[in-house]
Amino acid sequence: MILLLDAGNTRLKWAWLAEGPARHTVHASPHHDLTALEQACRITPPRRVLGASVTSSERNSAIMAAVGRPVEWLVPAASCAGVTNAYRDPDRLGADRWAQMIGAHHEQPGDQVLVSAGTALTIDCLDREGRFWGGTIAPGLGLLRHSLAEGTARLGLPDGSWQEYPDNSADAIFSGCLNALTAPIEAQVARFGSQLGRPVRLTLAGGDAPLLAQHLAIDGTIVDNLVLSGLAHLARMSC
């Protein structure tokens, strides 16, 4: 069987490649405890392992030790699987973003702004021809809140909720950080649509996608595990 790995900043997601159109079952493991992955690979040794990683080389080595064989780590290229990379240095694009775009282009082709809301917030523009125009990277919600707490003497990291007009610091921090994420998403959708001269779709992925969807002024579609979907497509072909 073929094993797919999405090694993110905070955890590892993994799945066995499903046959045909079936959706793969996704598992998640913290980087400090890969026992479940190791046990699964002992029971069913993978014949091939494909992965996309944005984590450290030390963690990548630990992952390879757990699976018991070398991992084919995805390296972004100038083009692959119908997607064209706009980066000046294509291999400097994050492997997770590259896999997500391949997954999005094949799962739901069309003009779209692809948002991944996790540790970082990435906003990428992908047209219906598979051309990646470029994108932005910013701190995610958790990083924004923690950086504010660490950079100030008295604000701390209180639990708050989003309010239109916050009347306390906890809600003010949460609302301000969330607004700092939704505004650039809305702006990029408008900008890309104007550039193309036609409507574009908003695709949301990542752990904070449901929260963002609740507070965006535009509609978006949440699509889970696009990195693994992109890897699954690549596993069925060669670039």
Curated annotation (Swiss-Prot):
Record keywords, A-Z: ATP-binding, Coenzyme A biosynthesis, Cytoplasm, Kinase, Nucleotide-binding, Potassium, Transferase
GO terms, biological process: coenzyme A biosynthetic process
InterPro entries xref list: ATPase_NBD, Type_III_PanK
Cofactor note: A monovalent cation. Ammonium or potassium.
Subcellular location as annotated: Cytoplasm
Residue sites binding substrate per the record: 87, 94-97, 169
GO cellular component: cytoplasm
Active site positions: 96
Any single Pfam family the record assigns to this protein: Pan_kinase
Family to which this protein belongs: Belongs to the type III pantothenate kinase family.
Function: Catalyzes the phosphorylation of pantothenate (Pan), the first step in CoA biosynthesis.
Subunit structure: Homodimer.
UniProt source species: Laribacter hongkongensis (strain HLHK9)
Record's protein name: Type III pantothenate kinase
Pathway given in the UniProt record: Cofactor biosynthesis; coenzyme A biosynthesis; CoA from (R)-pantothenate: step 1/5
